[in-house]
Amino acid sequence: MNDYSYEKGIAFIVEGATERVFYEEYLKKLCSERGMTITKDEKSQENKYTICAENRSILVLINNVGSVSQMTNSATWFHRACVKEYSNIGWSVFLCYDTDAYNSDITKFHEGDWLRLRQSIESDAESIADLAAQADIEDVMLCDFQGVLAFLGLDNNTPMPKGRKGKVKIKQLFRRSDPACAYHEGERARALIQTLDIDLIEKHSSSTTIRHQKSRGF
């Protein structure tokens, strides 16, 4: 058990390493805007963060499952790393995943294995919410297309590459910037993500890219 005095816990269950980095940077931005601090526990084997504001402390744990197909198996992690380890606080859970298509119906992520995942964690969660990105997380990043171009040193008149997925488009932009320079996912994408205009991404994604479905009154 852990006796640190937290007010509440927030669990992010994310699809891949790039999603983890993106939401880490997004949390940093939100904390900065609200006069809060966010600190990563470098000694923990988990992706563990503490958000502090005045006398309040909020625990954040992020589970990177590797692929959307593995996300439905994450209930074990939630019960072990969150509920059992910090049983004295309430938990809000965010399921962060790609729908893989711009017109994909989010309701399919409430059926089958996904329904069983929600049922297995809902008794120990104060709320469960979906952060569903249409196609790749890179599509979200491309909402700040000018920011991506600036990071790569490309002219601001550079056209958006063709391709169905954002990951394909970003890879093309990296090659256009430098044929020897490749786009890397995960931690190596942090430098790019840190330069992006999160406010702009948030503005665009609220209507076109990220769909946030709430449940249980969250």
Please state what every model-predicted region is.
Residues 1-88:
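Short, surface-exposed loop/strand segments
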Residues 7-8, 90-91, 124-128:
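Short glycine-/polar-rich loops that comprise or flank the Walker A/P-loop
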Residues 13-14, 89-104:
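Acidic beta-strand-to-loop metal/phosphate-binding motif
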Residues 15-16, 95, 141, 211:
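Short, conserved catalytic/metal-binding motifs centered on acidic residues
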Residues 91, 99, 109, 205-213:
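P-loop NTPase catalytic cores that bind/hydrolyze ATP
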Residues 97-182:
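Activity-critical C-terminal alpha-helical subdomain
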Residues 180-218:
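Charged phosphate-binding loop/patch that engages nucleotide di/tri-phosphates or the phosphate backbone
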